[in-house]
Amino acid sequence: MNDLKSKSNIKLMKRVLTTYELRKYLKKYFCLTLDNYLVLAYLDVFKNDEGKYFMRDIISYIGIDQSRIVKSVKDLSKKGYLNKCRDPHDSRNVIIVVSVKQHNYIKNLLSEININET
């Protein structure tokens, strides 16, 4: 194997290990999956005054399988991080609703995760 390929493989394995460690860390200390974390991070980054987000936008932006995001949103809803409902104008669309209190909790949680992670 050439030197460049070996270095590339090492970098890839480091990323895989980092992802694995992050998954374990989130689960152990925060009872979150990596998918949960990605959804919460999306809600924090794209915070808006209405606190409303379309599920399809979250799925599109995060770029992982739709079923994983749907499962994550359902889990986060049960845990009280967000609420979900059908769009009254088009029942095919799911709207994620996040109150100011929920946004503050998400922001604090993400800050805690980032502090502890370093």
UniProtKB/Swiss-Prot annotation:
Top-level taxon in the UniProt lineage: Bacteria
Q: Name one GO cellular component term.
A: cytoplasm
Q: GO terms for biological process?
A: regulation of DNA-templated transcription; response to stress
Where, per UniProt, does this protein localize? Answer: Cytoplasm
DNA-binding region (UniProt annotation): 55-78
Q: Name one Pfam family in it.
A: Staph_reg_Sar_Rot
Q: What induces it?
A: Repressed by SarA and agr, particularly in the post-exponential phase.
Concerning InterPro entries, the annotation shows: MarR/SlyA-like, SarA/Rot_dom, Transc_reg_Sar_Rot_HTH, WH-like_DNA-bd_sf, WH_DNA-bd_sf
* Molecular function per GO: DNA binding; DNA-binding transcription factor activity
Tell whether Translocase is among the UniProt keywords. no
Annotated keywords: Activator, Cytoplasm, DNA-binding, Repressor, Transcription, Transcription regulation, Virulence
PANTHER family linked to this entry: ORGANIC HYDROPEROXIDE RESISTANCE TRANSCRIPTIONAL REGULATOR, TRANSCRIPTIONAL REGULATOR, MARR FAMILY
Role summary = Transcriptional regulator acting as an intermediary between major regulators sarA and agr and virulence genes. Represses alpha-hemolysin (hla) gene expression. Down-regulates agr RNAIII expression by repressing sarU, a positive activator of agr expression. Up-regulates sarS, which induces the expression of the cell wall-associated protein A (spa).
Q: Which family does it belong to?
A: Belongs to the SarA family.
What protein is this chain from?
HTH-type transcriptional regulator SarT
Task: Name the encoding gene, please.
Answer: sarT
